[in-house]
Amino acid sequence: MNKSKEEEKMGLITKIYQDNFLQRFDKDEAVPYLEPSDFPGLICEQNTFQNSSGIMICYYIYFYPGFVQDRNILFCPGMGPGHSAYMAEIETFCRAGFKVLTLDYSGCGASGGERMPSVNAPVRDAVELLDRVHLYKIIPVGHSLGGYTALCISNLMPVVKRAVIISGFVSISDEMMGFVRFRILANRVKRFEKKLDPQYGKIDNHKYLQNTTDKLLWIHSTDDPMVNYAHNAGQVLKKGNPNIRVITVEHKKHNPQYSEEALKTMNAWMGGYNRLIREKQLDTPEARKAYFNDKPVSKMTEQDPAVMGEILRFIGS
């Protein structure tokens, strides 16, 4: 391959990355989400702050009366319309006595921003949030992009001594290795991220994972189509750090925290929804909402008691 073709291919990879990752993420208003009101007694405090880029960030504190003092979680959502897609997880932690701090990143959900500025923007938002609320005795827990965010926060903040990464990635280049064959192409995206965010784009999680004395719990399914197991959890295992425990699960794809029944239900209902949209059978907002009338969202978000039990024991120890 001559140089011009190689550069053209790298440019295409960067464009695909921008088009799929660096966009605005809002709710599909037809798709149901759990609400705080679905959980009697759950308290939600909503606030905002302006981040260093001038974007208004919405953040939330969830808890039940009688929560245990100094048992705080920072829940880092995955890429998508914000924390509301994770209310089942958040409520599970609150029910166990934790206070949960969470946020919608720049360009996501209720927060401002025309798009997500970079994959490291959530890290910046979360760090600035922690600096604001002063909950320094806190455990980051995150899924997917949120898993990467939780990992970076644990790396960056000495006060964090424990973190949970669910289906997360080590770096953006390791994430891209699930979609491209050559490391040189994946590294192109890493260099692009450094240009987008020179401060947070240079984070070296590999060195951190090799040497850290922090306690980390990493949970990943071997058949994850979104974040490749071998290039992420597999690399963590190879480092052999005794302070990091990797729980490998099978047949859970990108959501190992969900029960098998919830995954089957979600795949069937959402698959049917997307198919009917493609077939132009759900052409109006009313028709799309009606599709979910007999499909309670709680059946799509039921937590796996074994996996959540492992997480709760880890963060409670």
Where are these regions (language model features)?
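An N-terminal hydrophobic leader/cap segment in hydrolases
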Residues: 1-51, 55-62, 274-290
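Catalytic nucleophile-loop/oxyanion-hole region of alpha/beta-hydrolase
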Residues: 80-83, 108-133
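Conserved alpha/beta-hydrolase
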Residues: 90-112
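Hydrolase active-site cap/lid region
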Residues: 152-201
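Short beta-strand/loop motif that positions the catalytic acidic residue
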Residues: 212, 218-220, 224
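Short alpha-helix in the alpha/beta-hydrolase fold that links the catalytic acid
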Residues: 228-238
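C-terminal catalytic histidine-bearing segment of alpha/beta-hydrolase fold enzymes
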Residues: 243-317
